[in-house]
Regions:
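N-terminal subdomain of nucleotide-sugar transferases
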Residues: 1-44, 89-90
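A short, histidine- and acid-enriched strand-loop-helix "catalytic/donor-clamping" loop
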Residues: 71-75, 91-108, 121
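Carbohydrate-associated surface elements
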Residues: 128, 147
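Nucleotide-sugar-dependent glycosyltransferase donor-binding/catalytic pocket residues
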Residues: 12, 16, 149, 173-176, ...
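Structural motif
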Residues: 65-67, 121, 167
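A short beta-strand/loop micro-motif in the catalytic core of glycosyltransferases
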Residues: 118-127, 142
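Conserved donor-binding/catalytic core segment of Leloir-type glycosyltransferases
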Residues: 5, 160-178, 184-191
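An amphipathic, basic-hydrophobic alpha-helix
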Residues: 30, 43-89, 108-110
Length: 191
């Protein structure tokens, strides 16, 4: 029996493709390495809308900790559904936020705010988001920076190519909100 359930976008039938799927898999793999078998609920699975309520009831019956990593609509549904189930099962509910959109969604959904206040913890990627959620009255928020397992290169292994024009490489979606304009301006000034 698993101690922990992770409910998120696994894409169990294929290789994870987007940031949400990658983070869900990285988190689950890390938890599994430390705590053993994890019960996975794949929000992308075929028939997931039908199966997921039953899977989550099973998770509430058998797991002590339930971690969710939903997108926008999934959060609205899952937060309220799990909070309702938790009145019966009294489990530790956790929400690992992916991206920076949560503080924009919550003011439009006071019912989700109410549900998330009942979660044991909410893990956000930045201090800015933590501050925004604290302004909404949350005290169960902590910062867990985004991560990805990478091999550490030894000194001398990294190729040194410092020739103009300098190249810009990013590890995120290219959007103005993420500061790509500032980064591009700096590289253009250097070149």
């Amino acid at each position: 029996m698993s101690r922990i359930c992770v409910c998120g976008a696994f894409r169990l039938w294929d290789v994870p493709k987007g940031g949400q799927e990658v983070k869900t898999c990285i988190l689950t793999d890390a938890l599994e390495a430390k705590y053993g078998k994890i019960y996975r609920v794949d929000t992308l699975a075929k028939n997931s809308r039908f199966l997921m309520p039953f899977q989550l009831v099973w998770a509430m019956m058998t797991c002590k900790d339930i971690i969710i990593l939903p997108a926008h609509n999934g959060l609205v549904v899952l937060s309220k559904f799990l909070t309702l189930l938790n009145t019966i099962f009294d489990r530790r509910l956790h929400y690992s936020v992916i991206g920076g959109w949560l503080q924009d969604l919550l003011p439009e959904h006071p019912d989700v705010i109410k549900a998330l206040h009942k979660f044991t913890s909410i893990y956000v990627e930045t201090q800015t988001m933590m501050d925004a959620l604290q302004k909404l009255g949350f005290t169960n928020v902590c910062v867990v920076p985004n991560c990805k397992p990478l091999s550490i290169l030894k000194r001398g292994q990294m190729p040194k190519m410092y020739t103009e024009p300098y190249k810009l490489v990013t590890f995120s979606r290219v959007t103005e909100k993420k500061g790509i304009g500032t980064a591009a301006d700096l590289v253009m000034k250097l070149n």
